[in-house]
Amino acid sequence: MDLPIVLSHKTAWLYHNVARPSEPFSRASSLYDEDSLANEAEPTASLPKLGLDAKGLRASTAVEIVADYLISLGIPREELDHIDTLVNFDFERSTPAGFRCHVFGAPVPPGHLIEVAEGLLVVDEAMCFVQAGSWMSEPEQLEYGYEICARYHLNHLSTGDYIEMGQRYTVADMIAYCNEDRSRQGAIRAAAVLKRVHDGARSPMETATAIMVAAKRSQGGLGYAKIELNHRVDVPNEFKYLAKAGYFEIDVYAPASGTGIEYNGSDHLDKQRSASDAERMTVLSALGFRMIVLTGIQFAHQLQLHRAMNAIALAMGIKCDRSEAFQKRQNDLREFVIRHWEGGL
């Protein structure tokens, strides 16, 4: 084909789910240059050759090639009834069966394109996040924001566990992209969602805890966005006789009230881990923090989590909404954030 195919929107989200985070990215310099597929930095392995650069390639054949490649990565065939693609301008749009073509309206920023195979690119997650508002609900987009800025990767298309990894984007990175052009479709909504996203979640459970606090009340959250994740607390010298560790990290922290929320999952049931947790709580309480623990069992039961969230609201000094309507929304949000936990609470 004359121009490389750029995966975008939901197809890009599907790709980022199954892509191995440890693989190096190959950035495209432009969609127009002859060297458009040149890398900013040499990848450690050659890119797959799919045959998309063959002269006179029929669009229907290109659809089949791309679909087969995505399926080989682990994307279910039923998710590929159409493949979302992106072009710079409307005159480049084509509508072969199997492709859903979106128009960016300007040259696509090359720094936000990743080459994944010869002749095939994908928008990066900053761009994909802005596009996500066209098919995700707000809670889904909020969760996606936390995942993009997290220190883990979770494949929503697999039943496997999450994997730990370095943080790839910061909230500041994402906001900066939104601010490049606020008139860009989806940018205003994405920027609003990012006000409730925070850097550095270490697990889906931490993300779930943060969402229960930060999501809007209309979505079942406490509507309290002024939190930090993994807030570091150094143990002062005069308290070091109380703990082995020199510092602790609080999973979710509200600075205004000094409230800390810890998520203790099933891995905290180990005897040694329980002893360390008890020591942590003792020291943090001695330092004046108002500590509250959430458990997987509470997340698994509506009323238990509702009571726990009431306690968090009380500690933070915000109103507890005990209405039936809010409890329904809160339970919907609870079910949403734990939908992939597969019993690993």
Role assignments for model-derived ranges:
Residues 1-185, 324, 331-345:
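Short gly/ser-rich loop at a beta-strand->alpha-helix junction or flexible surface loop bordering the NTP-binding
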Residues 164-345:
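Surface segments flanking catalytic/ligand-binding clefts of nucleic-acid enzymes
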